[in-house]
Amino acid sequence: MTAAGPGAAPSPGRCDSDPASPGAQSPKDDNEDNSNDGTHPCKRRRMGSGDSSRSCETSSQDLSFSYYPAENLIEYKWPPDETGEYYMLQEQVSEYLGVTSFKRKYPDLERRDLSHKEKLYLRELNVITETQCTLGLTALRSDEVIDLMIKEYPAKHAEYSVILQEKERQRITDHYKEYSQMQQQSTQKVEASKVPEYIKKAAKKAAEFNSNLNRERMEERRAYFDLQTHVIQVPQGKYKVLPTDRTKVSSYPVALIPGQFQEYYKRYSPDELRYLPLNTALYEPPLDPELPALDSDGDSDDGEDGGGDEKRKNKGTSDSSSGNVSEGDSPPDSQEDTFHGRQKSKDKMATPRKDGSKRSVLSKSAPGYKPKVIPNALCGICLKGKESNKKGKAESLIHCSQCDNSGHPSCLDMTMELVSMIKTYPWQCMECKTCIICGQPHHEEEMMFCDVCDRGYHTFCVGLGAIPSGRWICDCCQRAPPTPRKVGRRGKNSKEG
C-alpha cells in the first residue's frame, strides 16, 4: 500500500463522506452552526481530541472579533422628565454579554418595544444610528440587567462598574468647571443702585424659606429621634394652668418618716369609717361575693330587719350620708366627728354588708311620686288596651319608668299588693331592670327580685352566693323589728331557724 501525500491523508476523526475539513471551516459557518435560530441545518458529529483543540482556537477567534466594549453600553432615562425610568437596549446588552439569543435565554426579564419618539431621542444622543432607527429595538429595565450581570456575569459587571465610575468622575469635573466659570462671571461689580433691591429679594426668599420650614416642623415633622439619647421626642400637649393659690405647696407636703403628719391624706366617708377598727367597728367586714353564704334565708331575714329599722328611723340621715358619698369627699375633720357622732346611735342596726346610705336612697319610695300615664298604651303580652285584658275585663295598665313598655298586672301575674307597691316608686320592666344597689343591668343570671316590691338585686350585692329558693323579701320591705347582731360573730345568724 503506497503512502499518500501530506494533503491527501485523511485525519483520524474525519468522516469520508464530508469533503470539507472542520479545521478549514470559516468563522461565518461556525457562527451559523452555534446559533439557536433554527434557520440553517446544523451539522454536528463526534470529534476527537485533535478536533477539540481546533474548535477552541476557532471560538477564541470569534470572541476576539465580536468583543463589545463597556463604553458602548448606554443607560438612558425615558421619558426624560421626573417620571422616567432607566433602560438599556437589549441589542447592546446581548452583544456586551456575548449572548446570541438573549430573549430565549432570559424570557422572564421585563421588556418593551421602543416607540418612534424614543428612537429619535436616542438618535439625538448618538446612542443608535439612523439605520437602527428603522429596525425594531427592545428596551430592558436597567436594574434587572445590573442584577443579572451581578449574578451570572461578575467580570462583565466589574468592567461596567469601572466605566460608570469614570463617567461619574468626568461629570463632577465638568460641573466644577461650569461652577468656576460662573464664579468668574459673578466677580463683576454690581451696580450700587440695585443693591437695596437685591437685599429685599434675599430677605423675602429667606422669610419664605423660614415659614415653609416652620410649617413642615409643625405639620409633618413634629416628632424626631434624638441620636444622643435614642429617645423619640414628641411635642408636649396643651394643659390648663391652675391658679397659683391652688398649686401652692403647703408646709407639710409629704411625710419624711413613718407616722409624721402631712397635708396629703385620704378622707374617709362615714360609711367607710364604720368598717374601720377605730376603737369599735360598727359594721362587720363585707362578705366576699365568691364565697357562699352560710344561711341565705337567715341573712336575708337579718338584712330585712335592719332595712325595716332603717326605713322607720333613719330617713333623713341616710339622705344626708348619700349626698356625701356622691360628692366623693367627706366634710372637714371637725364636722366629720360631729356627723359621725349623730350617725352612730341611729345606724347601729343598719345592713352590715353594703353601704346603708346608698341602699336606703335607691330602695326608698320617692315622696309624691306619680306613675307614668300613657293614654293609648297597649299590653306587650295580649296587645290590648286598658279596656280589655286577656280575660276580657277592663284593667288599668302599668308602665315602665324608663321605656314605653306597658302591661296588664294579670298578664304579668302580679297581685294587687304588688301593683300598689309598684306605683310608689319608678318601676322598671324586665328589659330595663337594674340592681338597686349597684345600678347595673349586667349579670342577669345572678339578679333576683323582691316578692313584695319587684325591685332587682344582684346576689353578690347583698352577700349571697346563689339565688335563694322560695320567697325572698328585700331590706326595704321588711316589717319585723330588727335583731341586733354582735360584731364578733361574723357569718353567723343571731336568730334560730
UniProtKB/Swiss-Prot annotation:
Pfam family, one: PHD
Biased composition (Low complexity): 1-13, 284-295
Localisation per UniProt entry: Nucleus
GO BP, one annotated term: positive regulation of cell differentiation
Renumbered zinc finger spans (PHD-type): 378-435, 437-480
Chain positions covered by the region annotation Disordered: 1-61, 284-368
Modified residues (Phosphoserine): S11, S35, S49, S269, S296, S300, S326, S330
PANTHER family the UniProt entry points to: HL01030P-RELATED (PTHR45888), PHD FINGER PROTEIN 10 (PTHR45888:SF4)
Protein name: PHD finger protein 10
